[in-house]
Amino acid sequence: VYKRQLLYLANIQEDRLAKGELKIVGRRDDGSAILEAVGEATAIPTTVWSGAQFSAGEYGSRYIKRFLGHRSFNFPKSLYATELSIASVVADKPDALIVDFFSGSGTTAHAVMRLNHQDGGRRRSISITNNEVSEDESKKLTKRGLRQGDPEWEALGVCQYVTKPRVTAAITGKTPEGDPIKGDYKFTDEFPMADGFEENAVFFDLTYEDPDAVELGVAFEEIAPLLWLRAGSRGSIIKYEQPGFAMADA
């Protein structure tokens, strides 16, 4: 695992670059170079981390409220703890694909956006979650005669109520109500949360499909998003099987 320190400089240190002590690994939006010290020692992350940035209450629960207002989520992880965890593995992999099989509030996707912002990377993340409602919410909805599958029930599920809005808010810099998010990101790469990220997100529903229909080629529309993901998630999704071809963005 690489332990790196990125140096964000407006003016390149020519001497250290010439000596090979530094190398340019990217550019920020303002044109300043992102430099990396050459020859740093490798290290295995420890099992116990301490520091203000790892507070799940301050940078997990309170951040959810900052991005989503009155909406809440139990025990979200610290954004910065998640960011550092991912960086310890993919800091030197700008094209990495990070898969979160139990995404919850979407902290992993948010952390990947921050890593890309820091070094100009093109990392992608796939967040997978169910749309369960909390136990308390389930009881309230049941008393009202609602059940799973009803639109009002589904609207309060974790995916619809927290994950999607949180990812959208992080990218746009605005709450679900359209208000600019207040505050700045801290510790590494500080900038206003309202600036958002130059990222894209698309949301899909996982469904069960008949294998025979897929094999016979009559379920192309249903599996088109998976084919798009498999091809690298670039350009538009070819939703219909028809003669001709489509050009994806390079």
Please identify what each model-predicted range represents.
Residues 48, 125-127, 203-205:
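Conserved beta-strand scaffold positions in the cores of enzyme catalytic domains, especially
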Residues 63-67, 142, 218-222:
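Short intrinsically disordered coil segments
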Residues 54-55, 104, 131-133, 207-209:
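Short, solvent-exposed coil/turn elements at secondary-structure transition points
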Residues 3-9, 15-18, 141-147, 179-188:
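Charged, glycine/proline-rich intrinsically disordered loops and linkers
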Residues 3-97, 119, 132-136:
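Class I S-adenosyl-L-methionine
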Residues 145-250:
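SAM-dependent methyltransferase catalytic region
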Residues 75, 79-171:
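Conserved S-adenosyl-L-methionine
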Residues 59-62, 137-139, 212-218:
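Short conserved micro-motifs at the rims of enzyme active sites and ligand-binding pockets
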